[in-house]
Amino acid sequence: MDIVQSSIDTLNHFYEISGVEVGQHFYWQIGGFKVHAQVLITSWVVIAVLLGSATIAVRDPQTIPTGGQNFVEYVLGFVRDLTRTQIGEEEYGPWVPFIGTMFLFILVSNWSGALLPWKIIQLPHGELAAPTNDINTTVALALLTSVAYFYAGLAKKGLGYFGKYIQPTPVLLPINILEDFTKPLSLSFRLFGNILADELVVAVLVSLVPLVVPIPVMFLGLFTSAIQALIFATLAAAYIGESMEGHH
């Protein structure tokens, strides 16, 4: 009987784990619209963290940077080098703020899933998680990137920008048009899938072995989250550079 009862308890435990829900959402009703409140709340927190950190770090700038100012200048230099490499020496300047904002928002959003105690905030439906854990956020970021590289191409070449769709031959017109749809799709689903999978793996491991085992996985998740932010920012800059250069 003890063996049977133990087996039943084990099955019940796995049943509870399988009940982890990823589709429950908390909405605010504003007029005739439903607003996805979870994403807004966590996104506002991430934005507040970024603005607060930047304000504190540079509130008393020094000629020889130290501490927070030194870190901010290092990040700025990293983003500037990344943007210059992908867009080019002559055109990269105006795009540093955009690429830097994308990189930092995605990085802090990804890390917030592991470093911020979202679970202690109870909602009527669903639960708070990293903003990039939601497909709405990643699609919005990808669409912003699409708007950016269309704007970059049109600002540089005018209507001649659309000539790229028939290069090197008009036969490739459908494929070149399709490419503009696949870019935001790949950007959004790559980021969403990686962050969601990471948080689900950690949640399951914490349910199974709540002490030591999840810690290395969490550190691995922080590393992969940083890589995903870097990949997104690099591809965004590459697409913008490509639209201004007019070649693939």
UniProtKB/Swiss-Prot annotation:
GO cellular component, one term: proton-transporting ATP synthase complex
Stored PROSITE patterns: ATPASE_A
UniProt subcellular location: Plastid, Chloroplast thylakoid membrane
Bilayer topology annotation: Multi-pass membrane protein
Pfam families: ATP-synt_A (PF00119)
Residues annotated as signal peptide: none
NCBIfam families: ATP_synt_6_or_A (TIGR01131)
PANTHER family: ATP SYNTHASE SUBUNIT A, CHLOROPLASTIC
Subunit structure: F-type ATPases have 2 components, CF(1) - the catalytic core - and CF(0) - the membrane proton channel. CF(1) has five subunits: alpha(3), beta(3), gamma(1), delta(1), epsilon(1). CF(0) has four main subunits: a, b, b' and c.
Family: Belongs to the ATPase A chain family.
Protein name (record): ATP synthase subunit a, chloroplastic
Source organism of the structure: Cycas taitungensis (Prince sago)
